A protein has these predicted regions:
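N-terminal capping/small domains of soluble enzymes
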Residues: 21-127, 155, 166, 174
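Glycine-rich tight-turn/loop motif centered on a GG-T
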Residues: 90-106, 135-165, 195-209
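Feature marks short, surface-exposed loop/turn motifs that line or immediately flank catalytic pockets
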Residues: 52-53, 84-86, 130-132, 191-193, ...
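Cleavable N-terminal signal peptides of Sec/SRP-targeted secreted and luminal proteins
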Residues: 4-18
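Non-globular sequence segments
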Residues: 113-116, 121, 127-182
């Protein structure tokens, strides 16, 4: 299902270390390299940055212009800004990318085709916001039940069923990204979003498995 597709976990700068420590002759940032099957024309990456390019389920004209310019400027690989896999209503910024439904695949395919036409690769960054929300919604999911800053309420400690649901949301989002033609996905596991909350003992007080 995910053959010839790269899945990368954003926790530390492991990917950048990987492509800068090859065996053999010393390389520089302008040299070509490979990441598994993926050919990189140099070691310049555009990191994941929110760019407000998505409105009402569509990529804006300014968004297409931005990615067109980025991919023309000799960047070998572009990471999108964070793209929500589910619970979109918990994002304060309503203009974040969404991949929680199949209906968004055609729009992203247009973006991918544009970037590929200009000779660059593109990865989609996937995220679940977890407790890092400012929105007053009924349920805010987290690894443990903790006070939510500025919301005067507690997060909901996720059940095993909740965990399996969101695991599946990530898997389905990655599959949609692949169908849209992305070269891979970056799983956001930093900056106090859901996955990093599970990795952090300050936010994960669970005693189960």
């Amino acid at each position: 299902m995910f053959s010839n597709f790269i899945i990368y976990l954003l926790c530390f700068n492991s990917l950048f270390l990987l492509i800068s420590t090859e065996q053999g002759a010393q390389k520089n940032i302008f040299d070509e390299t490979n990441l598994k099957h993926l050919k990189l024309k140099n070691r310049f990456f555009r990191g994941s940055v929110g760019d407000n390019s998505f409105k009402n389920g569509k990529i804006t004209e300014e968004g297409f212009k931005l990615y067109d310019q980025l991919s023309k400027n000799e960047v070998s690989n572009i990471f999108t800004g964070y793209t929500t896999v589910s619970d979109y209503n918990q994002f304060e910024n309503v203009n974040v990318f969404r991949i929680d439904k199949d209906e968004y695949i055609p729009e992203f395919k247009k973006l991918v085709d544009l970037v590929h036409k200009n000779g660059a690769n593109i990865f989609m960054q996937l995220v679940h916001i977890g407790m890092n929300t400012k929105m007053k919604v009924d349920t805010v999911y987290g690894p443990s039940s903790l006070p939510l800053q500025g919301l005067n309420k507690m997060s909901k400690e996720m059940t095993k069923e909740d965990i399996l649901r969101i695991e599946n949301d990530f898997a389905e989002a990655a599959l949609r990204a692949k169908k849209a033609g992305f070269d891979g996905v970056e799983i956001h596991a930093a900056h106090f979003y859901l996955i990093s909350e599970f990795l952090n003992p300050l936010s994960n007080k669970r005693t189960d498995e």
